Amino acid sequence: VAGCELAMAMAFALRAAGVKPRITVIELGPEISGVSRQARHRILLAMDGLGIVIKTSARVIEVRADQLLLDGDSPVAANLCVGAAGGLAHTWIAKTDLPQRDGFIEIGADLGVVGDKALFAVGDCAVMPHALRPKAGVFAVRAAPILHYNLRAALSGNERKTWRPQKHYLKLISLGGQSAIAEKFGF
């Protein structure tokens, strides 16, 4: 959904500057992911209203100065390419001996790295296998007070607190101008 937000923001800004852009969003999956059916419908309507084309089930195989080459499809002309791939594992993590799951540092409920009481990790570099959540900034922000407490506890020898990440959170998805849709609990 981040690529859609970026496309709509750029379309809005360019139109405000008097430019009529041709924008194409290329989505690897069969549809925009990470949102409910209702939100997806509203996003697609907003993109259509801004003249943004979306190509789904499309794989970019090469980025050139003036076009994107797609696997099994015609090239897409481009003056500017912007990538938005979501939360991906950092390559440096794979080069460490830290415990990992799918390239993310494995942490426990106290935000400590599994097997090492002196290390902590939160945010997009970490994963809590017992409480899997999407990669969204809200979780790192909400973990901060527990991380702060547990860092102090680790230094003083006190007991650590457990963090329980919320299951539902508010998503605000910009539609390109001064409007957005809100989604929580799948609506």
Question: Language-model segments: what does each one mean?
Answer:
Residues 146-187:
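C-terminal, flexible cofactor-proximal segment of oxidoreductases
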